């Protein structure tokens, strides 16, 4: 008789043997180093336990973790030493918590925006697929679902759910890539310092307000770039700006995006900072939909004539030539 761990091992060996005999099946086989399951059928009950088990600074190989279907209420931290992690979710894998900025910590102090996050990602070369990152605190002020400081972070088919300040792109030297993701929130729910690309994402506003609040550092060539994204709202929402500048050198560019009628004609807001109009870079390229109104846009914004210099591989290249579009599959390969 085999227990669940032995059964999984035998199954894995069997699949490997079949794939070895029929090589064309190999591309459909995905190996997992750890499995997280609430019902005890995996290696760990919680995601944090699996993260903690990953060897520090495991180079030249990825550690792949499968998260079984379920709602995991945890405050997850992926420290800088846990490099090259792939977190893969079954349908219905939700990582959630309900902290918020004005909630008190054990010392009676406010947690603050940064302290409110449900998940913190510091380790470079992190990959997540089919995971829901959620802050379930509701409309109580700042309540971050995911705080990303990692460089070369790649999110595919993930969901980011919250209200105010859902996605905090925190790392000043961080490059982040979001592909086919869903992000919802209120106020300016995508915010921070990082260079971040959103490709074919669905961006959903739950209240009037702003989609983004970049805090791009002076001298940075890029900030936020949205490619072929769809911007939608709840039925009662009618007045949303594409962005307002958290810091004076904020950058946000929307390329070929479908803008709903909730996007105001002026499109961009200066957050009451007239001087920032001279230093921000806000731009669009062939926006479409009822919210596309290039002639009425704020005078300090731009309409790009072409996309030279705004290729995804250019925006994210940095000094190491990172190109998640070309090399994305390497993010999920596991050496045997």
Provide a role label for each language-model segment.
Residues 25-336:
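Sequence-level preference for short, compositionally simple segments enriched
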Residues 1-24:
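Histidine-centered active-site loop/cap adjacent to the catalytic His
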């Amino acid at each position: 008789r085999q227990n669940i761990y032995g059964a999984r091992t035998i199954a894995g060996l069997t699949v490997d043997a079949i794939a070895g005999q029929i090589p064309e099946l190999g591309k459909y086989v995905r190996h997992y180093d750890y499995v997280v399951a609430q019902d005890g059928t995996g290696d760990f009950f919680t995601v944090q336990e699996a993260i903690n088990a990953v060897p520090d600074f495991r180079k030249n190989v990825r550690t792949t973790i499968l998260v079984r279907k379920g709602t995991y209420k945890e405050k997850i931290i992926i420290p800088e030493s846990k490099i090259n992690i792939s977190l893969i979710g079954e349908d219905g894998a939700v990582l959630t918590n309900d902290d918020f900025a004005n909630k008190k910590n054990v010392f009676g102090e406010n947690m603050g925006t940064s302290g409110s996050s449900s998940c913190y990602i510091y380790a470079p070369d992190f990959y997540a697929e089919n995971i829901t990152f959620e802050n379930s605190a509701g409309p109580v002020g700042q309540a971050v679902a995911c705080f990303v400081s990692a460089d070369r972070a790649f999110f595919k088919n993930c969901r980011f759910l919250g209200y105010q300040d859902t996605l905090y792109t925190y790392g000043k030297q961080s490059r982040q890539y979001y592909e086919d993701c869903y992000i919802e929130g209120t106020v300016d729910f995508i915010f921070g310092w990082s260079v971040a690309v959103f490709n074919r994402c669905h961006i959903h506003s739950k209240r009037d307000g702003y989609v983004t609040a970049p805090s791009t550092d002076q001298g940075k060539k890029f900030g936020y770039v949205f490619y072929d994204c769809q911007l939608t709202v709840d039925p009662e929402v009618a007045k949303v700006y594409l962005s307002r500048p958290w810091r004076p050198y904020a950058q946000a560019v929307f390329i070929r995006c479908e803008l709903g009628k909730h996007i105001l004609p002026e499109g961009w807001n200066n957050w009451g900072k007239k001087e920032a109009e001279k230093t921000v870079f806000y731009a669009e390229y062939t926006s479409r939909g009822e919210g596309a109104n290039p002639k009425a846009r704020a005078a300090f914004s731009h309409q790009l004539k072409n996309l030279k210099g705004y290729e995804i591989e250019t925006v994210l290249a940095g000094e190491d030539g990172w190109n998640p579009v070309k090399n994305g599959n390497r993010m999920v390969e596991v050496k045997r």
